[in-house]
Amino acid sequence: MGCCTGRCTLIFICTLQMLVALERQIFDFLGYQWAPILGNFLHIIVVILGLFGTIQYRPRYIVAYTIWTAFWVAWNVFIICFYLEVGGLSKDTDLMTFNISIHRSWWREHGPGCVWRLVPAPPSKNLGDHSFISVTGCIIEFQYIEVIHSAVQILLSLIGFVYACYVISVITDEEDSCRHK
């Protein structure tokens, strides 16, 4: 491959995807969001695989990355629907924590401009050591921050998909031309 523009761009996109996924992973860990943590972990592994395939001219690894991007886009569309409460989904359920805790998005209490204070729990609720928290003054609501994260992931995945298909095409064309010589 004399000109590496496609490969170099795919390497850049994969690196950017890795950085964005690591940032998202940190905030999902802070919020104990186990489903996104698992998804981000798998995504990071597959992006590393795609990066390796791109650097080492291994089209099968790039194909695996390409297939994964379709699943990753679907997962992020689900997250957008979840936080925007589309189709009967509710951001107030414990779905993202696999129903094992009452934690929510870290951004719910720590978003830009958010001020939170503890509110006494009603006597009818037995929350153990948990308490109610009142959050006010947020510049942007937490669900929109989560939607922006997912939208960025979708955008990077779609761009990565296009470049991965291009790089696969170029690599296989080069392999075919080498076989016919």
Curated annotation (Swiss-Prot):
<feature type="transmembrane region" description="Helical">
    <location>
        <begin position="62"/>
        <end position="82"/>
    </location>
</feature>
<feature type="transmembrane region" description="Helical">
    <location>
        <begin position="151"/>
        <end position="171"/>
    </location>
</feature>
<keyword id="KW-1003">Cell membrane</keyword>
<dbReference type="InterPro" id="IPR008516">
    <property type="entry name" value="Na/K-Atpase_Interacting"/>
</dbReference>
<feature type="transmembrane region" description="Helical">
    <location>
        <begin position="5"/>
        <end position="22"/>
    </location>
</feature>
<dbReference type="GO" id="GO:0005886">
    <property type="term" value="C:plasma membrane"/>
</dbReference>
<comment type="subunit">
    <text>Interacts with atp1b1 C-terminus.</text>
</comment>
<keyword id="KW-0472">Membrane</keyword>
<keyword id="KW-0812">Transmembrane</keyword>
<keyword id="KW-1133">Transmembrane helix</keyword>
<feature type="transmembrane region" description="Helical">
    <location>
        <begin position="35"/>
        <end position="55"/>
    </location>
</feature>
<dbReference type="Pfam" id="PF05640">
    <property type="entry name" value="NKAIN"/>
</dbReference>
<comment type="similarity">
    <text>Belongs to the NKAIN family.</text>
</comment>
<protein>
    <recommendedName>
        <fullName>Sodium/potassium-transporting ATPase subunit beta-1-interacting protein 3</fullName>
    </recommendedName>
</protein>
